[in-house]
Amino acid sequence: MQVILLEKIQKLGDLGDLANVKAGYARNFLIPRSKVKPATKTNLAKFKLIKAELQASEAKILKNAQVIESKMTGTVCTIQANAGEEGKLFGSINTSDIQISLAASGFEVEKRNINMPETIHHTGKYEISVDLHTDITVSIKVVIEGFQEA
C-alpha cells in the first residue's frame, strides 16, 4: 500500500515522502496514529496544499527538541533505592523510575522515549539515552544510590 508520510518516520522517510508499506501496518498502526494518509489522488492534492504548514510545525517541534537537548545535556539523575550491603537492589530501576526522576528535574519525557538496554539491578552510574525527536538523542547519566532500611 502506498502512503504519504505526515511526519518523519525512521526507516520509511521524511515528511511528504511516498512510501510503500504493508496494508496491515498502514491500517492498524500508521493511519490511526495520524502518521500517514493513503496515497490517493485527492489526498495527494490536499497534501500539496498543507505541506508548508506541516513542514513549519515539524521545524518548530525540532527547534523545541534542540532547546531541550541543550538543557538536558550533562543532566545527572540521582535515584535512591533500597539496596543490600553489596549494592544489589531490592527490586529494579526501569524507565518509569527514570521518567519520574527526569520530571522532578523539570524534563517531561515519555517513558517510551527512554532507551535502556536492560533494567538496573545494582547501585552505580549508568549512561541512558533519551530520544527527544527522530533526529535528536541525548545521553544522560543516572546514578543509583542505595540505602538500607533499619
Swiss-Prot record:
Q: Does the keyword Transmembrane apply?
A: no
Q: Which InterPro entries does the protein's record reference?
A: Ribosomal_bL9, Ribosomal_bL9/RNase_H1_N, Ribosomal_bL9_bac/chp, Ribosomal_bL9_C, Ribosomal_bL9_C_sf, Ribosomal_bL9_N, Ribosomal_bL9_N_sf
| CC per GO annotation | ribonucleoprotein complex; ribosome
Annotated keywords = Ribonucleoprotein, Ribosomal protein, RNA-binding, rRNA-binding
Q: Which GO terms describe its molecular function?
A: rRNA binding; structural constituent of ribosome
Q: Which GO terms describe its biological process?
A: translation
Identify the Pfam families for this entry.
Ribosomal_L9_C, Ribosomal_L9_N
Is the Cell membrane keyword given for this protein?
A: no
PANTHER family in UniProt: 50S RIBOSOMAL PROTEIN L9 (PTHR21368)
Q: Which family does it belong to?
A: Belongs to the bacterial ribosomal protein bL9 family.
Briefly state the protein's biological role. Answer: Binds to the 23S rRNA.
The cross-references to NCBIfam families, in alphabetical order and at most eight, read: L9
What name is this protein filed under?
Large ribosomal subunit protein bL9
Q: Which organism is it from?
A: Ruthia magnifica subsp. Calyptogena magnifica
Ranked from the top, the taxonomy reads: Bacteria, Pseudomonadati, Pseudomonadota, Gammaproteobacteria, Candidatus Pseudothioglobaceae
